[in-house]
Amino acid sequence: MFPNILDDALVHFYTQKGNYGSIYYDNGKIEYIHYLPICSYDNKEYYLFHCNNKFEVIADYLFDSIEECMNMENRSKKEIVWIKNNCNEIY
């Protein structure tokens, strides 16, 4: 089950586990992106997180809306299916 909170941010949408690219570090380490959650803190901005297979955030990008987050990933990757996290309605 996908977490409702990541890095103290509320999860609004997420993807199924997949291969969404990788991040290469200067020290030679490679981390693979397995999840793409869209989250928010208490402000009105939204973050597109890149998470590893342990749901750890390894990169984030700030946008003004959920739609901007989705459009950014939909342009760079084909056929992303976004899953709405209905659990956030209890907060």
Enumerate the language-model features and the residues they cover.
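Negatively charged, low-complexity tracts enriched in Asp/Glu with abundant Ser/Thr
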Residues: 1-29
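Mixed-charge, Lys/Arg-enriched low-complexity segments
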Residues: 52-91
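Short aromatic-glycine-(Arg/Gly/Cys) micro-motifs in beta-strand/loop hairpins
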Residues: 30-58
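Acidic-enriched, low-complexity/disordered segments with a strong bias for Aspartate over Glutamate
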Residues: 7-8, 26, 42, 60, ...
